[in-house]
């Protein structure tokens, strides 16, 4: 049990130095803060998927995956002739 506590304090030290030690915890200034951020981000994505439905959520991901620093996903989709059905982005009623 002591090794678990030691590992936690090591991770907390790294987090306080600015290192991301929890996937999805970017920006947290401590181990606990990073864990809370990661949990909130995960929950936010799940809620959005429930609101839009799996199909709309996937379609939005397709569009976002096409974006770059130079152009938005919508601009690239139009330029390359990729069909993105934005009607699927609407939340379910």
UniProtKB/Swiss-Prot annotation:
<dbReference type="InterPro" id="IPR022377">
    <property type="entry name" value="Sm_Hydphi_plant_seed_CS"/>
</dbReference>
<protein>
    <recommendedName>
        <fullName>Late embryogenesis abundant protein B19.1A</fullName>
    </recommendedName>
</protein>
<comment type="similarity">
    <text>Belongs to the small hydrophilic plant seed protein family.</text>
</comment>
<keyword id="KW-0346">Stress response</keyword>
<dbReference type="GO" id="GO:0005829">
    <property type="term" value="C:cytosol"/>
</dbReference>
<dbReference type="Pfam" id="PF00477">
    <property type="entry name" value="LEA_5"/>
</dbReference>
<dbReference type="InterPro" id="IPR038956">
    <property type="entry name" value="LEA_5"/>
</dbReference>
<dbReference type="GO" id="GO:0009737">
    <property type="term" value="P:response to abscisic acid"/>
</dbReference>
<feature type="compositionally biased region" description="Basic and acidic residues">
    <location>
        <begin position="9"/>
        <end position="19"/>
    </location>
</feature>
<comment type="function">
    <text>Lea proteins are late embryonic proteins abundant in higher plant seed embryos. It may have a role in desiccation tolerance by acting as an osmoprotective protein or as a desiccation-damage repair protein.</text>
</comment>
<feature type="region of interest" description="Disordered">
    <location>
        <begin position="1"/>
        <end position="93"/>
    </location>
</feature>
<feature type="compositionally biased region" description="Basic and acidic residues">
    <location>
        <begin position="73"/>
        <end position="93"/>
    </location>
</feature>
<dbReference type="InterPro" id="IPR000389">
    <property type="entry name" value="Small_hydrophilic_seed_prot"/>
</dbReference>
